């Protein structure tokens, strides 16, 4: 099978694929997967079957393959389920027909999406979950469906900034290199009591973890838990025992919020209260939205 050219940059090509390559095998199943799901859109990409495969389709297929160690059967099943889920949730409706949901004051200040310059010089999208901003636990977490829609909305905004449909950078095969199309995630626990676990919070946390694991594979590069009391850091160490080594490597526990900037990246992209030199989270988010608006116009 010939090398695949990126539609947005003719000079960028995907490494040549053999007929028995996992990507080639998964691509050959696309007609059935798309037909059974009744849906073909995901993360800004419209999946299409062709030989050779389109560059953006390979980006999506590679993420699903890497998430299951190149098991083609498992990747095909997972992709089909995710496409059906996205159809049911109406996540890929055209912008002019998609109503922007207003989640109200219960979610104000709880989530942000920004961009930083990593220590290695590359850009990275960051999602911020500010649990200390919750005003009323029941109002925010009590309606599980509404909470999950809010959390998915935050994730979808972050993914949009990855520009998966137009990238010209391929994803290496499983165990052959780092996926460059991922984001960091910061969980801020300042002001949160670790001594009691509200049942609504527990249910929302469990449902969110399951939903994200099933429908958003290979999208996180690093996961920071900030403001965790030293006495509770053992809990996160224990969690490492129950997840894969690859997932555990992404966990970074930080007890003092001022130490976050040194771990995350360039100081100008991190607010001052977290050890950086940047603007507030809201201002950094608006800055990113403005940059993308100019780029897409």
UniProtKB/Swiss-Prot annotation:
GO terms for biological process: Golgi to plasma membrane protein transport; regulation of exocytosis. Heme binds at residues 131, 151, 187, 189, 223. It holds the Pfam family CRAL_TRIO. One of its GO terms (cellular component) is endoplasmic reticulum membrane. The keyword ATP-binding does not apply. It comes from the Eukaryota. The keyword Metal-binding applies. It catalyses: a 1,2-diacyl-sn-glycero-3-phospho-(1D-myo-inositol)(in) = a 1,2-diacyl-sn-glycero-3-phospho-(1D-myo-inositol)(out). Its main location: cytoplasm. Its cofactor is heme b. It is found in: Cytoplasm; Endoplasmic reticulum membrane; Microsome membrane. GO terms for molecular function: metal ion binding; phosphatidylinositol transfer activity. Belongs to the SFH5 family. Non-classical phosphatidylinositol (PtdIns) transfer protein (PITP), which exhibits PtdIns-binding/transfer activity in the absence of detectable PtdCho-binding/transfer activity. Regulates PtdIns(4,5)P2 homeostasis at the plasma membrane. Heme-binding protein that may play a role in organic oxidant-induced stress responses. PANTHER family: PHOSPHATIDYLINOSITOL TRANSFER PROTEIN SFH5. This is Phosphatidylinositol transfer protein SFH5.
